[in-house]
Every structure is written in structure tokens, then in C-alpha cells.
Design a protein with these regions (language model features):
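Charge-rich, low-complexity N-terminal segments
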Residues: 1-59
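Compact, glycine/acidic-enriched structural inserts
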Residues: 1-12, 113, 119-120, 126-149
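Generic structural motif
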Residues: 32-37, 69-71, 119
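Well-ordered beta-strand positions
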Residues: 36-39, 63, 112-113
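The feature represents the first ordered module of a protein
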Residues: 47-97, 102
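Low-complexity, flexible helical/coil segments
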Residues: 80-84, 124-127, 145-150, 156-160
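Conserved, surface-exposed functional patches that form binding/active-site neighborhoods
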Residues: 83-134
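Cysteine/selenocysteine-centered motifs that mediate thiol-based redox chemistry or coordinate metal-sulfur cofactors
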Residues: 147-178
Length: 178
């Protein structure tokens, strides 16, 4: 590992999802209560409140292991709404033998989807800096880029509509407000 890691660079963020305890341990080690977990053949649905955040009051996410994605719909507080419709993290997802504990490792790249209009890729600089700092190996970085390109291509081919693309790759997530 490089001894001169820029201050904005961090190791890959890890989250835990414990279905039996109904908790989500975030990347800072804070344990959050989960309102709902739902396991489907293609992934895990997570719904929880976001406490003590001035802009966001809740979230729904789908962990999609075969796609290497976490797709999130944020619920913004009044006056803090954003144009984005889905936030996609490129992740590695591990599931324990019981299927009751899921783990994500964030691979820095994020995609912001404005349904029917566009998708933006964020944090490419963080990915590259993490590789240079020895926090992520090149094979993992290449896999993250391939996942990002595949996701961009799928979204573009389906009019930037997540709900049209995901079923073509075996995932049919449902959302509480869509």
C-alpha cells in the first residue's frame, strides 16, 4: 500500500445486512434498524429509515449479486428533492451460507439515473486513486469498470429506464412508490 494516500481516499466501504436481526451495519459501523427485508431469486430488498440526515428520511435498495449492483431510491425531505430517480453503486455482494447475512463492498463507481433522460457516472477519480494507493487491485477495478459499462449500455438501450432494462438481465425489482 502506498504510504502517501490522498486524504479523500478511503478503503472500499463495507456494509452488512443481517436479515435475522433486521439490521444494516453501515460503512461507519453504525447499526441501523431495517423496516423490511425481502429475498427474491435475483436479490435482496432493503427498506429503512435514515435517521439524523438533513436531506434524506428513508431509502429503499435492491442488492443484485449477479449484476454487481446496489440500486437505491432515496426519499428526500421536503425542500431537498433531487432530479435523480435511482442511485446505483457498483459493488461486490457476498452472501453467507445460511443466506441470512449479506455483505457489500463498494467499488467506488456510482451511476445516477434520471429516468427516461440520462445517466451520469461518478467517482471515477476515487476508483483510480484507490488503485494507485493500493486499496483496490487492478482486477477488481477492471471488473468494476466492466460492470459500469454493461450498466450504461443496458440503460441506454432501454431509454434510461431501469424498469425496462433490469428484467432483460433477470431482475424485476419492485418499489414502494413506483
Amino acid at each position: 500500500m502506498n504510504a502517501h494516500i490522498p486524504p479523500h481516499i478511503h478503503p472500499p466501504k463495507v456494509e452488512l445486512f443481517d436479515l435475522d436481526a433486521m439490521t444494516n451495519t453501515d460503512s461507519k459501523g453504525i447499526v441501523r434498524e431495517v423496516r423490511e427485508y425481502r429475498v427474491e431469486p435475483f436479490g435482496l430488498y432493503v427498506a429503512r429509515d435514515v435517521i439524523d440526515h438533513r436531506r434524506i428520511h428513508a431509502l429503499e435498495s435492491w442488492l443484485l449479486p449477479e449484476l454487481g449492483l446496489r440500486v437505491t431510491d432515496w426519499f428526500y425531505r421536503p425542500g431537498h428533492e433531487r432530479e435523480e430517480h435511482h442511485y446505483i453503486d457498483v459493488v461486490r455482494i457476498d452472501i453467507d451460507a445460511s443466506g441470512r447475512c449479506w455483505r457489500t463492498q463498494d467499488h467506488y463507481l456510482d451511476l445516477v439515473v434520471c429516468t427516461g433522460r440520462s445517466v451520469d457516472v461518478l467517482d471515477t477519480d476515487e476508483l483510480l486513486d484507490a488503485v494507485l494507493a493500493g486499496l483496490l487491485d487492478s482486477a477488481t477495478a477492471q471488473a468494476a469498470l466492466a460492470t459500469t459499462y454493461r450498466t450504461l449500455d443496458g440503460l441506454a438501450r432501454h431509454g434510461y429506464r431501469l424498469e425496462r432494462w433490469l428484467p432483460t438481465v433477470g431482475a424485476s425489482p419492485t418499489w414502494s412508490r413506483r
